[in-house]
Amino acid sequence: MERLGPVFPLLGGWRSSSVRHARSEEERLVSQYVSRLGRRSPAASPRLRLHRRPRRVAMLSVHTSPLHQPGTGDAGGMNVYIVELAQRLAAINIEVEIFTRATSGGLPPSVQLAPGVLVRHVDAGPYEGLAKEDLPAQLCAFTHGVMQAWAGHRPGHYDLVHSHYWLSGHVGWLAAQRWGAPLVHAMHTMAKVKNANLADGDTPEPAARVIGETQIVAASDRLIANTAEEADELVRHYAADPAKVAVVHPGVNLDRFRPFPKGTEPGPGERVDARAAARARLGLPQDALIPLFAGRIQPLKAPDILLRAVAVLLDERPELRSRILVPVVGGPSGSGLAKPEGLQKLAARLGIADVVRFRPPVGQEQLADWFRAASVLVMPSYSESFGLVAIEAQAAGTPVLAAAVGGLPVAVRDGHTGRLVQGHDPAAYARVLRDFADNPELTPRMGDAAARHAQSFGWDSAAAATADVYTAAIHAHRRRVRSHHG
């Protein structure tokens, strides 16, 4: 197998950024976020007992920290995935140490995220002002930091390496080779898939990423795909060995994302409108059609499609203007339409600025309330490996209007828990929004079905399946080592 050595110089040719000073505000936010996460440690399900599981896993997330608020910068579904999975693995006695790049000089070397889950900050490149596109040049420094942390332990400290996203995969490849441990990798997104589904004005993924992902696929002992379609894409685009690919659906925190906040469920015989209660808490009009966008503001997520669809709807049905409200909850990320001001200007040009409300990213508890309050969550994405937000909204009792791309057809049952649209024609989305406006009973009917559908996506099941993948990877790695040594 080709060794990793030549890869880092290739990746290092990308541009570098200037160094900025760390801000104490980030440290404060990280501290608050960790304290919130640490208050919950889910109990292990009795059935999640696996034979010869790993004792300790090194999890790698180079470009985004699990301590960052989802919806800001490059923090999104992958952050939620890592946090929830790590906590559930710890609950079944698999310790997890997460290595991530330090983005502030004042961060401690390590932070306990939850019992059995440790986050290690690695110094690699400037703390701030470093775009994700510049990170390949810092992979050598990040790898050095990971090796330094490992050097303080006895051999065999980590039973397995689990890397997330292609940048982490290269570090994981080197670490796994050095430690004599198996490598499990999760792509989360793939360059070839993204490039085949680019939004207008978006930047194609570079050839270096395609080469890097191909090498990681070949080097991994096991690959985790969110859906069967993603597994097929790994085989079709990257020549992955089908025997090494395992499908594990991500989960949803069913304690947090539920029709009623925990502890507020109505008693026997009591009738309470969960949507009305959420709207009252958020100060939203009770009788409005509320199509919600929640996520990072970037071309890939296509929030502009929602705005254009609303403009089409109001052109056809101007009387709806007085009873429609379009919240856009999220922060800037990526390229092209990265700044909220770009969407604000678009709303003004379309003549709908009066019905659109831009809100910054919110914590998970308040996000759940936004889901409960919405008539429908709108996800017109050009590419989604799974779409955690779709499952979270459904768990909260809200239907989803989504593009029929990636894992969204798995997350959303078309016609039952929401609607899927082929392509990205705003008029097609406008037609579905008109259905919700003309048939108010659609939201509660589909919302009830959505909440039931989401029950099958718990994180305990995802952790159990992931632990099975770990066990298979360890056994395969041991067999390969034995065969190489006669």
Report the location of each language-model feature.
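N-terminal subdomain of nucleotide-sugar transferases
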Residues: 15, 29-119, 478, 482-485
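Carbohydrate-associated surface elements
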Residues: 229, 251
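Conserved donor-binding/catalytic core segment of Leloir-type glycosyltransferases
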Residues: 285-301, 307-310, 327
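Nucleotide-activated donor-binding/catalytic signature segment of Leloir-type glycosyltransferases, i.e.
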Residues: 330, 338-361
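Short alpha-helical donor nucleotide-sugar binding micro-motif in glycosyltransferases
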Residues: 361-362, 369-374
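Aromatic "clamp/platform" in nucleotide-sugar-dependent glycosyltransferases that forms part
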Residues: 382
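Short hydrophobic beta-strand element within catalytic cores of glycosyltransferases
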Residues: 390, 399-402, 412
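Conserved acidic donor-binding segment of nucleotide-sugar-dependent glycosyltransferases
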Residues: 414-415, 419-426, 435-441
